[in-house]
Amino acid sequence: MNQVTKIAVATTLSLGTLLGATAGASAIHADAHAATEQQTPYYTYNGLFNFKGNKALEDKNFYRALQHDNFKYEGLKVGQSTFADVKKSVGNDVKKYYEEKGVTYYEKNDVIFGIDSEGKLVNMTLLIEKINHSDKSVRDHVKQGEIYDTKTTHVAFYSGNSIVIKAKESR
């Protein structure tokens, strides 16, 4: 009887070790897989943008999100949002700025929204001239004259002045 007990204990230990090693290897494989998956950078900005203490221009994630076509201001995305979305996000008191080539531009809190004849947000200009060191911050992250050509937008940087996000024309 003693020998049967020893065999049962040895079998249980061997089987437990084998199952534990298999489960452990499986978990290691899953962790390695998760670590290699890339996440698309995004940046959502809410509130007044053009003010002295704004640190967004110093944040590399701000530029990475613009590069990857994944930036939203007050929940608004160029090429997807509508004029109704703009009014809902920033208020009905947007001021008409000017009209050019079928696009009407509205301004609120130093952000200019370009709305096409179909009511779609096709242009967003973030004024940055009031932000401390805006010229240097942009130059630290973007080459002079560089334009981000993303899937649905073009992003142009005018150091010390503005950042323009423009929807690509649909063909």
Regions found by a protein language model. Name each.
Residues G119-L126, N161-E169:
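Short, well-ordered strand-loop elements centered on a beta-strand within folded domains, enriched
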Residues Q3, G20-K143:
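Short helix/turn-capping signatures at newly exposed starts of structured segments
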Residues N2-A21:
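Sec-dependent N-terminal signal peptides
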Residues Y148-K168:
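Short, exposed beta-strand-loop hairpins at the edges of beta-sheets
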